[in-house]
């Protein structure tokens, strides 16, 4: 199964990567504005509307800046652990629908 991994940006101003397989189109972190994520995905011929999920590594703002906009407006599932969910909900004063995983455990 071919895997495509593209780093869309990494640094103190934001972190975001795109992972694609035959069945999955995953954004890893959402540390840029929704507009910037759209532009960065467009530069590789992709769009946020086609994402199958967003994997959040942790709750720092340079990893979650547009997470509420992506998940709520575009109805994209969010994958994270419970502490990250709670921190993001507190930070943005919103409720996220997350598919939770345990840190260190495998999941599909």
Where do the model's predicted regions map?
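Conserved beta-strand hairpin/beta-sheet module of binuclear metal-dependent hydrolase folds
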Residues: 1-44
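Generic structural signal for residues in well-ordered beta-strands
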Residues: 5, 78, 96-98
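Short, solvent-exposed polar/charged micro-motifs at secondary-structure junctions
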Residues: 16-17, 60, 107-108
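Short glycine-enriched loop/turn motifs at secondary-structure junctions
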Residues: 22, 71-73, 92-93
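Active-site metal-binding motif and surrounding structural segment of the metallo-beta-lactamase
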Residues: 34-85
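Metallo-beta-lactamase
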Residues: 82-108
């Amino acid at each position: 199964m071919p895997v495509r991994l593209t780093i869309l940006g990494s640094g103190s101003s934001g972190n975001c990567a795109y992972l694609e397989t035959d069945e999955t189109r995953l954004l890893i972190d959402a540390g840029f504005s929704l507009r910037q994520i759209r532009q960065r995905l467009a530069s590789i011929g992709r769009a946020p509307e086609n994402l199958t999920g967003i994997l959040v590594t942790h709750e720092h703002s340079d990893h979650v800046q547009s997470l509420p906009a992506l998940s709520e407006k575009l109805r994209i599932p969010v994958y994270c652990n419970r502490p990250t969910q709670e921190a993001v909900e507190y930070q943005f004063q919103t409720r996220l629908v997350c598919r939770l995983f345990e840190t260190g455990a495998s999941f599909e």
